[in-house]
């Protein structure tokens, strides 16, 4: 019983520490103190938190720290960054260096930073239409053969920043796509890689990236079994 009490106490302490870390992170990210953020979004209906959004890039309700808004974060290619910014800016009034408002009560704070050959963009917003527009626009992080070109395609024993990026940036995007959408993405990239990747290198990258996805490995397995059945017959 005492052990359960201590575990519960440690869990509550960890939760408090996580909450404090979230508060500090959001203040730093949007360069605004928590009181201001809470006041800005105070008029947001609590029912908004149940709005459904696609899994990628996802929208996290920040009500746990008293901010009635969604946090949206994703990495995009540098070439896509102006398009992303325009989604935020067009049709909204700029009321601060990072803040925009629509219809008087729909607020958006925007932040961006260079991040592994791309841009990490973040929103704090109660604008459901904007969240849906961002989700529907199909923004993607820079592909691994650009973001980590110097490491090559041997990515089976990653560590440090590269491991973090693959697991938390790339995989999160890549696994949000269907296999057909992955096929289309790769086909769209094919014409731009000739200047720096040979056919053999390109094939190595594709094998390394695609086999990270369990669905693709299952597809390969099914194709192998089918070929075996066809050969037997």
What name fits each language-model region?
Residues 2-233:
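Polar/charged low-complexity regulatory segments
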């Amino acid at each position: 019983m005492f052990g359960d009490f201590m575990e519960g106490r440690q869990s509550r302490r960890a939760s408090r520490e996580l909450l404090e870390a979230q508060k500090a992170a959001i203040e730093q990210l949007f360069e605004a103190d928590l009181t201001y953020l809470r006041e800005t979004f105070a008029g947001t209906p609590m029912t908004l938190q149940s709005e459904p959004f696609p899994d990628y890039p996802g929208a996290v309700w920040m009500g746990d720290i008293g901010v009635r808004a969604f946090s949206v974060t994703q990495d995009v290619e540098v070439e896509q960054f102006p398009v992303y910014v325009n989604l935020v800016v067009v049709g909204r009034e700029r009321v601060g260096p990072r803040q925009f408002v629509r219809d008087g009560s729909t607020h958006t704070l925007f932040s961006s930073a260079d991040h592994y050959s791309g841009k990490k963009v973040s929103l704090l917003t109660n604008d459901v239409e904007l969240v849906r527009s961002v989700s529907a626009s199909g923004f993607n992080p820079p592909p691994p053969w650009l973001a980590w070109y110097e490491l090559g395609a041997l990515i089976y024993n990653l560590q440090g920043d590269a491991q973090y990026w693959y697991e938390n940036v790339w995989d999160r995007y890549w696994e949000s796509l269907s296999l057909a959408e992955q096929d289309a993405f790769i086909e769209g990239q094919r014409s731009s890689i000739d200047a720096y990747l040979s056919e053999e290198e390109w094939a190595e990258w594709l094998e390394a990236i695609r086999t990270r996805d369990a669905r693709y490995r299952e597809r390969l397995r099914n194709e192998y079994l089918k070929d075996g059945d066809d050969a037997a017959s």
